[in-house]
Amino acid sequence: RQYAFGGGGIMEQVHRVVLSHLDYDGEGKILEVGCGSGALTIRSALTWPKAKVIGVDYWGAVYNYSKALCEKNAASEGVASRCVFQHGDAKQLDFPDESFDVVISNYVYHNVMGADMQKLLLESLRVLKKGGVFALNDDMKPKMYGDMEGFAQKLRDMGYEEVRLVDTAQEAFGS
């Protein structure tokens, strides 16, 4: 497998921090946008044993990840029956509106070439159920994402009830 939760790697800590910020009861469906090797999808399934977790990824030529690798990794962690992996595009998710209780993404959106980041976020929010939880962990540079405080206010104006921007760098990296 191409990841290891117990190896003391930084991504294990990042995943724990991302998931620790979710106010989620563990029921229903989780979507990970840009699942790569499946590590965060699998960590979510391990954290919430009643949840069904779907990981989507483009699996382009840049990284050596694939659907088959994700499925192998999920099987090795004993969660294959609750994890589904499928090819997908973060710019146009192939799910109906309000399909998921939780949508998560970890260090993915900055890799989506030619995307308007705020439109990309709105696409992820489109598949989130009302009252659901969205967590994005990424390099939130203003020149890439624009004014995120303004975007957070736009989301509030659109009816999203709780919108928080949380800097997790200290928790995840200790810096």
Q: Can you say where each PLM-predicted feature lies in the sequence?
A:
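Conserved beta-strand signature within the Rossmann-like core of class I S-adenosyl-L-methionine
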Residues: G131-D138
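Conserved SAM-binding loop of SAM-dependent methyltransferases across substrates and taxa
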Residues: S37-P49
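Class I SAM-dependent methyltransferase Rossmann-like catalytic core
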Residues: R1-V17
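A short acidic, Gly/Pro-enriched loop at the edge of an enzyme's catalytic core
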Residues: K91-V103
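Helix-to-beta-strand junctions that scaffold the AdoMet/dcAdoMet cofactor pocket
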Residues: W48, V112-G114, L128-K130
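A short glycine-rich, Lys/Arg-flanked "PGG" loop and its adjoining helix->strand segment in the class I
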Residues: Q118-K130
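Conserved class I S-adenosyl-L-methionine
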Residues: G26-G36, I54
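Conserved SAM-binding strand-loop segment of SAM-dependent methyltransferases
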Residues: V79-A90
